[in-house]
């Protein structure tokens, strides 16, 4: 990691939250699927391809991994139904890897099947 990246990483916690929000807003589409698809549409009109990511990882509760998997499935439904030039980025620990490999495989296979 470059020296500049290290400085930025160490400085961010010291910044006022409203300043961090101004910087983050360039990269965070919003809090809902509707927000994400709206922003994706805007970027697609400018000829950008988009990767959508749900923030979070290291989930330890099975029910949460199911909820997160279902959100990704709905996100894929919206990407397809709106013909968005987009994909999703999934962190293995967000869909159960920390709980166990079988939980992760089950959730990952659901997403792969939906994405076909």
Task: Explain the meaning of each model-derived region.
Residues 1-116:
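Alpha/beta catalytic barrel-like cores
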